[in-house]
Amino acid sequence: MTTLASSISERYIGLMSGTSLDGVDGVLVDFSGPRPMLLTDAYVPFPPALRQAFFDLQSAGHNEIHREALAANALADLYAECVAQLLHESGCDPREVRAIGAHGQTIRHQPGEHDGIGYTRQTQHAAVLAERTGIDVIADFRSRDIAAGGQGAPLVPAVHRALFALPDAWRVVCNIGGIANLTVLPPQQSDARDRVLGFDCGPGNALLDYWVHAHRGEAYDRNGEWARSGWIDAALLETLRSEPFFARMPPKSTGRDLFNPTWLQQQAGDTLERIRPEDVQATLLALTADTIADAVRTHAPRTASLVVCGGGARNGALMQRLAAQLPGTLVAASDDFGVPAHQVEALAFAWLARQCVRREPGNVYHATGAAGPRVLGTIYPA
């Protein structure tokens, strides 16, 4: 068993299960050097029943407190399995790991722009994870930022800056999970170097995954091939892009609370029945790519490159559409810059755990809109 007080290790584990509801990404990271060193990574897929349980918990339903507790327990089992894989593959003893940063599964995100302090819920059973692994667990990273008047998101800009910022050029990092978010990184040798901007810009894979599952029974559209087989419906795309969220200025955040099947049905109406399903898929892909590109043009018009991470980086059709929408900007997956696309967010939560252990702020407060820098996370000692 290891404790925050007794350990001097700079090794941390980060665990992330995002709004795509596909599974758990885990990384073991060593922070003892000038840059984070990824020692190993692991992935544990969600069983279909758990994926459905989390999807159902994103809207009101019967006996949801009980159902959330069961889902949180099941997630703790998957997190513990992911930790076991990381330790086994690296040969690392649990006592050598300072702490685990566990994000949990977002089921509600209401930062409260209109009625005071809001809330966010990343369900998990961190106490069970600490018990199973014998390692201190840091969880609930977003609540403190919201308590300070922020959006609770995005929490990854500081890590994006450490990994991807350029000395003499603007760069944008885009994480495309269920929701897409941007980090705008100024040149680090300029007077603007501290003006890091981060915000959610709209749907990522969430609507694409929903539509392909509803019509083909597949968890996701591999490489965007089904979307490639369809035609973009210009009228539907224009209707979807009329959503007021897209025009709002940062700081802003969103989730499946907004961009969900109900929203799609309300926006599109009977168009979903009149055109081919693959045409809807093509249009949803264009919605994701075009709203990301709009945000880049608006908030980082001088950017030299767009670094894409998350599951969307593996969607060739989506990456192609992004590049077409941003001529003159290099669009590439984070793998091309030395960090595998699926590891970036998990690495961020390892870093946030380290910040909490060191009692140092984890939020970029001018990106989230919080009143100031805050130490994020709740500690569950082993």
From Swiss-Prot:
Pfam families: AnmK. Pathway: Amino-sugar metabolism; 1,6-anhydro-N-acetylmuramate degradation; Cell wall biogenesis; peptidoglycan recycling. GO terms for molecular function: ATP binding; kinase activity; phosphotransferase activity, alcohol group as acceptor. ATP binds at G18, T19, S20, L21, D22, G23, V24, D25. Keywords: ATP-binding, Carbohydrate metabolism, Kinase, Nucleotide-binding, Transferase. InterPro entries: Anhydro_N_Ac-Mur_kinase (IPR005338), ATPase_NBD (IPR043129). GO terms for biological process: 1,6-anhydro-N-acetyl-beta-muramic acid catabolic process; amino sugar metabolic process; peptidoglycan turnover. It is an enzyme of class 2 (transferase). Its EC number is 2.7.1.170. It comes from the Bacteria. Coiled coil: none annotated. It catalyses: 1,6-anhydro-N-acetyl-beta-muramate + ATP + H2O = N-acetyl-D-muramate 6-phosphate + ADP + H(+). HAMAP family: AnhMurNAc_kinase. Belongs to the anhydro-N-acetylmuramic acid kinase family. Catalyzes the specific phosphorylation of 1,6-anhydro-N-acetylmuramic acid (anhMurNAc) with the simultaneous cleavage of the 1,6-anhydro ring, generating MurNAc-6-P. Is required for the utilization of anhMurNAc either imported from the medium or derived from its own cell wall murein, and thus plays a role in cell wall recycling. This is Anhydro-N-acetylmuramic acid kinase. It comes from Ralstonia nicotianae (strain ATCC BAA-1114 / GMI1000) (Ralstonia solanacearum). The lineage of its organism: Bacteria, Pseudomonadati, Pseudomonadota, Betaproteobacteria, Burkholderiales. The gene is anmK.
